[in-house]
C-alpha cells in the first residue's frame, strides 16, 4: 500500500524540560538538511503515530484531565495510541525511557522491540497534554500533532 505523503498524519511530540523552576532548558534536535519535513530546523522529539501504538500495553493509566483533553474534538488515534507514540518517539530519537521496569506480555508490538529489550514498559502517567497543532497547508508533509510535557 502506498501512503499519501500529503495526507495529514496524527503525531505526538514530547517537550523535555530540565531545571524547570530555576534555569529551564529544553531538549531539541536539529533535522537533517535533506529531510522532507522542516529541513535544518530545531525540533522536539516526536513523530507520526504508528498503527501498532494502539496495541502497546501501557503500565500506567493516562491521567485525567489529560485523557479527556486528548479525546476532545478528535477523530483519529486514541489517547492511548498518542501517548504510546510520544513515548516511542522519545526513545527512538533520544534514548530516554519513559517507563518502569516490568515484563511485556507477548507479543511485543512491531516497532517496540528495542524499548522492550531494555526491560521497561511505557508509563503514560508523567505525560501532560499541552496543545495540538496542525501543520499549515502547502508543506510537503502535514501532521496533526499533540504536544506533551
Language-model regions, residue ranges each:
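N-terminal leader/linker segments that precede catalytic domains of diphosphate-processing enzymes
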Residues: 1-149
Amino acid at each position: 500500500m502506498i501512503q499519501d505523503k500529503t495526507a495529514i498524519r496524527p503525531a505526538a511530540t514530547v517537550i523535555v524540560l530540565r531545571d524547570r523552576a530555576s534555569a529551564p532548558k529544553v531538549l531539541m534536535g536539529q533535522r537533517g538538511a535533506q529531510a522532507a519535513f522542516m529541513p535544518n530546523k530545531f525540533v522536539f522529539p516526536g513523530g507520526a503515530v504508528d498503527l501498532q501504538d494502539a496495541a502497546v500495553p501501557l503500565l500506567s493509566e493516562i491521567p485525567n484531565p489529560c485523557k479527556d483533553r486528548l479525546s476532545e474534538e478528535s477523530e483519529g488515534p486514541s489517547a492511548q495510541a498518542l501517548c504510546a507514540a510520544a513515548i516511542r518517539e522519545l526513545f527512538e530519537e533520544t534514548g530516554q525511557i519513559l517507563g518502569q521496569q516490568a515484563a511485556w506480555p507477548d507479543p511485543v508490538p512491531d516497532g517496540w522491540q528495542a524499548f522492550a529489550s531494555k526491560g521497561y514498559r511505557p508509563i503514560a502517567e508523567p505525560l501532560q497534554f499541552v496543545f495540538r497543532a496542525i501543520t499549515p497547508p502547502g508543506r510537503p508533509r502535514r501532521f496533526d500533532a499533540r504536544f506533551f510535557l
